[in-house]
Amino acid sequence: SAPWDVTVSYGAGTALAPDALIEASTQLDLYDASAPGAWLGGIATADIDYSLQEESRKLRADAERVIEHLEEGGAPDDERIERRLRRINEGCAAMNDNIYRQARQWLSQGKVVGLVGGDHSTPYGLIRAVAEKEGSLGILHIDAHCDLREAYEGFEFSHASIMFNVLRDLPQVSKLVQVGVRDYCDAEAERAASDGRIAMFDSRSLARAGFAGTTWAESCRRIVDELPEVVYISFDIDGLTIEHCPHTGTPVPGGITFEQVVYLMECVADSGRRIAGFDLVEVVPCPEDKIDAVVGARVLYKLCGLALRTSSA
């Protein structure tokens, strides 16, 4: 897990998700029709590294000063801001290396590795490790956002930059299939339209297709057809409709439902493709309302089960 939320640009708190998801997981029944008996293959959680959480807390204070400075119209080349940005970027790079080393260790033992964030910057090291191991793969990216911004707010490893960084740095990633996106800038729209590696199934287009009579099964076939044989799933909880994640850091109206996304992931597994790794990010737990963690735990269990099912097929 990566209890880390340094670069969040709106609401914080996703660094607390790993603990909350473990707690919520105790309310799960083991039978899963998507992958019956998959849990018998073994699902384990590595110990949470609370030193990461503490480093995140310290760097988050720097990030808040940077964001406030920029929002107030301050110059990005202010010397104090540059010092803070340097600390943040160095800290995020170290976090990525930490995750990368852990992932390589587990992958070398033949494990299927998933990561629980944390914000959406956290899976970079895992994606890198899985990409290097597999040689070639595609990413199924479920999200309200494209995450194709370059160094958003000056943060080289921003949660809004994860897919920009992946496409720039990892030639093994042959395809990025984005589903549910509905909040993005002109530059991201232009990038998605011009880069042949990107297939975007935005929330508006999916909804309009449904209104015009296209079934969700037909839409899922189109989505899955874009994916290569080896798939990594990057699941930002805010890709779901807002009742499933009311406290996530950057909530956006619209999206896809829990049942729709489960069907989509089942279609990936049913197609014979192999899920080689995954992440679940941007879950923000709330002490007064457990729904974010409850939904997150169930998404995570589905990801684990389907990954195990496809790895043993």
Residue ranges and their predicted role:
Residues 1-313:
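Conserved alpha-helical scaffold segments that buttress catalytic/binding sites
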